[in-house]
Swiss-Prot record:
<dbReference type="GO" id="GO:0006083">
    <property type="term" value="P:acetate metabolic process"/>
</dbReference>
<dbReference type="InterPro" id="IPR000890">
    <property type="entry name" value="Aliphatic_acid_kin_short-chain"/>
</dbReference>
<feature type="binding site">
    <location>
        <position position="14"/>
    </location>
    <ligand>
        <name>ATP</name>
    </ligand>
</feature>
<keyword id="KW-0963">Cytoplasm</keyword>
<dbReference type="InterPro" id="IPR043129">
    <property type="entry name" value="ATPase_NBD"/>
</dbReference>
<keyword id="KW-0067">ATP-binding</keyword>
<keyword id="KW-0547">Nucleotide-binding</keyword>
<comment type="pathway">
    <text>Metabolic intermediate biosynthesis; acetyl-CoA biosynthesis; acetyl-CoA from acetate: step 1/2.</text>
</comment>
<feature type="binding site">
    <location>
        <begin position="208"/>
        <end position="212"/>
    </location>
    <ligand>
        <name>ATP</name>
    </ligand>
</feature>
<feature type="binding site">
    <location>
        <position position="384"/>
    </location>
    <ligand>
        <name>Mg(2+)</name>
    </ligand>
</feature>
<feature type="binding site">
    <location>
        <begin position="331"/>
        <end position="335"/>
    </location>
    <ligand>
        <name>ATP</name>
    </ligand>
</feature>
<comment type="subunit">
    <text>Homodimer.</text>
</comment>
<dbReference type="GO" id="GO:0008776">
    <property type="term" value="F:acetate kinase activity"/>
</dbReference>
<dbReference type="InterPro" id="IPR023865">
    <property type="entry name" value="Aliphatic_acid_kinase_CS"/>
</dbReference>
<comment type="similarity">
    <text>Belongs to the acetokinase family.</text>
</comment>
<feature type="binding site">
    <location>
        <position position="91"/>
    </location>
    <ligand>
        <name>substrate</name>
    </ligand>
</feature>
<dbReference type="GO" id="GO:0005737">
    <property type="term" value="C:cytoplasm"/>
</dbReference>
Length: 408
């Protein structure tokens, strides 16, 4: 079975074609600047051969048509025709309270995704555009929605409820949902394998650190607490997001600066985080370099980022009643030795110690803790696309079995 994995954003579309026989990516691609001038599609084959093409991409449907052309290209493609694509897996950011697992897409699932538009206005609408475009181009091909929020449905009510009037939850669904679930699920599963223990016996804290960052406490393979909340704004400080702050700060700034609700939302989501504190960049490589040259605001931004995560690790050790491993993943978590070192400094009192040389290794699964550490520290490159492809394959095969078992 070959599964096409789609992650449709507002002006971009990431994709992978995965051969599920050996779970290998045949091609990885990206459409950029959809609906904007100077659109481009890039695709890299399993053998390293690369396609790069500037072309007009006015909408997601045209972008997906270009994806199919790239995948079937006589020189750069990996399949002869679109018929070789057996199923499509779509990343959908928000499933609300309706989905605790991935789902075969039908009219009811589509409507439920649309019902969550107001919960994820920046993500669900383009996710849905990706689904609709695929349905037009590939009619009859089974499609599966894999939700970022689904993994966190095992968080108990006392952890996901906010101490607000209960009627607001009943009316508007205001509660913690959590995000990056596909990534947290994948690395938690890999952590159990690396530890050589059954999933049900493992307690891990997974740190998905990128421009958006979230931490999750995983017990027995299930999420029991996470930092992101009603939206991805809650939690630790991030690249451009402020993370958790005193809520009273919001009306105070609005009054003092004369900001509208849209403007304060933009300030907290796009102008804050390490970018806001440093007044320099949301790229941690730039901040590292600036801090090493004595830029105090860059150093402060990095200190805040690391401290907030360190504090959550302590909280989650209490929530889990002990921990087997701390896992680092995603762009920063996988690649920044300096950030990992900052976060884990002075935690030897709770059994966390890292090997300086192992910590410098990049791009592979590795245990970077010292032999005498009682808590393992694991770096695990995430693979959300493979998780989406696995769910898609499982659901499609189950559907085929169900249909074949129905008497005629």
């Amino acid at each position: 079975m070959k599964v096409l994995v789609i992650n449709a954003g507002s002006s971009s579309l990431k994709y992978q074609l995965i051969d599920m026989t050996n779970e290998s990516a045949l091609a990885i691609g990206l459409c950029e600047r959809i609906g904007i001038d100077n659109s481009i599609i890039t695709q890299k084959r399993f053998d390293g051969k690369k396609l790069e093409k500037q072309t007009d991409l006015p909408n997601h449907k045209i972008a997906l048509e270009e994806v199919v052309k790239a995948l079937t290209d006589s020189e750069f493609g990996v399949i002869k025709s679109m018929d070789e694509i057996n199923a499509v897996g779509h990343r959908v950011v928000h499933g609300g309270e309706k989905f605790n697992s991935s789902a075969l897409i039908n009219e009811g699932v589509e409507q439920a995704i649309k019902d969550c538009f107001e919960l994820a206005p920046l993500h669900n609408p383009p996710n849905m555009m990706g689904i609709s475009s695929c349905q037009e181009i590939m009619p009859g091909v089974p499609m599966v929605a894999v939700f970022d929020t689904a993994f966190h449905h095992t968080i108990p009510p006392y952890a996901y409820m906010y101490a607000l009037p209960y009627e607001l939850y009943e009316k508007y669904g205001i509660r913690k949902y959590g995000f990056h679930g596909t990534s947290h699920f994948y690395v938690a599963k890999r952590a159990a394998a690396m530890l050589g223990k059954p999933e049900q016996d493992v307690k891990v804290i997974t740190c998905h650190l990128g421009n958006g960052s979230s931490i999750t406490a995983v017990k027995g393979g299930k999420s029991i607490e996470t930092t992101m909340g009603f939206t991805p704004l809650e939690g630790v400080a991030m690249g451009t997001r402020c993370g958790s702050i005193d809520p009273a700060v919001v009306p105070f700034i609005m009054e003092k600066e004369g900001l509208s609700t849209r403007e304060i939302d933009t300030l907290m989501n796009k102008k804050s985080g390490v970018l806001g504190v440093s007044s320099l960049s949301n790229d941690f490589r730039d901040l590292d370099e600036a801090a090493s040259k004595g830029n105090q605001k860059a150093e402060l931004a990095l200190e805040i980022f690391a401290y907030k995560i360190k504090k959550v690790i302590g909280e989650y050790i209490a929530v889990l009643n002990g921990v087997d491993a701390i896992v680092f993943t995603a762009g920063i978590g996988e690649n920044s030795a300096t950030i990992r070192k900052r976060i884990l400094a002075d935690l030897d009192g709770i059994g966390i110690k890292i090997d300086e040389e192992k910590n410098k290794i990049r791009g592979q699964e590795i245990d970077i803790s010292t032999p005498d550490a009682t808590v393992r520290v694991l770096v695990i490159p995430t693979n959300e696309e493979l998780t989406i492809a696995r769910d898609t394959k499982e659901i499609c095969e189950t559907e085929v079995k169900l249909r074949s078992s129905v008497p005629i």
